[in-house]
Amino acid sequence: MIGLRKIKNTIIFIVTVAILTMLCSCCKRSEIKLGSGNEGGIYYKFADTLSDIDENITNIRTAGSQANMRLLKGGFINMGIVQSDVLSEAVNGTGDFNGNKINNVRAVAALYMESFQIIVPADSDIQTPADLKGKKVSVGEEDSGVAKNAEYILNSVSLDYNMIDVCNMNYQKSAEALKNGSIDAFFVVLGAPCDVITQLSEKMDIRILPLDDRTISYMTNLYDGYYETVIKAGTYKGIDEDVKTVGVKAVLVASQKMDSDTVADITKMLFEENDQIKKRISFANNDTKFATDNIPCAFHKGAVVYYNSIGTAITEEDKI
């Protein structure tokens, strides 16, 4: 009898383990493909940080905001990081998405502000964006987001690309060209502080051109997804006063089809693990007001569940 009881208990144990294993397998979240950007960029670094915190997240290297929106539309990724101005164009079918409106993407949270930074040597006679007329200026790589942003800034002061000597270089090459005197200025659209300007400020004295109230009003009123912001004194070596400028938000978005519980968990992680995120991205946002204010896209219902649970009242329809 004892032998039979042992056999019976062993069978029960094996069956229980099998059932638990099967249940755990079923409960485990599916892989979450998160579209980021170019390796070495902040989008890639941010996505890498999230994947370190949540093993179900896989960082997918992409060409950036526009690519992420199109990959989400096609169902090739589950989530993506995008500039707020690109998000606005995509969900409204304007600009680069004219006739190609994207309806299946929802907002999760704004992650941080990407500030427009126009860098010149400290001793330059260039004081405002209008002074760039006739100057040799790097506006970022051809067809990049920063190139479009730079064009908008120039338009705001009645300039266009035909009125400056345009160079199309990436940030690192632009910084090197400014240092050796082969260009007069370059545009950057990144979270501040960013490595490329921090490193340049250690090698030469620089200034960041401020934007006046008229230019800021022009940018924020004419284009959805642009915001007034300030680069604080001390952000970079030699920048001893606050610099008024504009920026776009880096926004985490998700496919509308994504499981609500999963999106709620990821939204929660952004805030509860913010100290961990800030170890790698010092300017990562931890304010729910910033995360949800004036986002040009409806929110995912999973994100809404989390925000409402902590007293931030939004709905799935909240957008600009």
What is the meaning of each model-derived region?
Residues 2-13:
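Bacterial N-terminal signal peptides that target proteins for export
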Residues 22-25:
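C-terminal motif of bacterial Sec signal peptides marking the signal peptidase cleavage site
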Residues 29-57, 114-180, 293, 297-302, ...:
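Bilobed "Venus flytrap"/periplasmic-binding protein-like clamshell domains
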Residues 42-73, 78-79, 239-240:
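Extracytoplasmic small-molecule ligand-binding "clamshell" domains
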Residues 74-113, 123-125, 191-196:
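Acidic, polar ligand-binding/catalytic clefts
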Residues 84-86, 94-96, 124, 161-252:
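Pocket-lining segment of extracytoplasmic ligand-binding domains
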Residues 135-152, 223-298:
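Ligand-binding clefts/hinges and TM-proximal coupling segments of bilobed small-molecule sensing domains
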Residues 169, 173, 179-180, 190-208, ...:
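An extracytoplasmic/periplasmic, membrane-proximal ligand-sensing/linker region
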